[in-house]
């Protein structure tokens, strides 16, 4: 789908998408011409945000995210938390295309 970004869209914080809802996102110019696109298969969370008054928007694939309001559980119980053993490696990547 498409979403028009306006100056107040992030006044209450980031837009957060869970459960792998977003695998590709992009920004277009006002005339609809593609400007930038991010492909991010396999990331459980995706954030779209901007600082108030900032001249930019961030598109970020996340492997985890901040707590929901009122969360009081342990760090190890958070959704999508990754725990690595000593010397274990976790590798993940995404692609950004500038049009």
Model regions and ranges:
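Active-site/ligand-binding surface loops and adjacent short beta/alpha elements
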Residues: 1-41
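A general structural signal for short secondary-structure junctions and capping/turn motifs
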Residues: 17, 27-28, 48-50, 85-86
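Glycine-rich active-site loops that engage anionic ligands at enzyme catalytic sites
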Residues: 29-70
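Short Pro-Gly-centered flexible turn/kink motifs
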Residues: 82-98
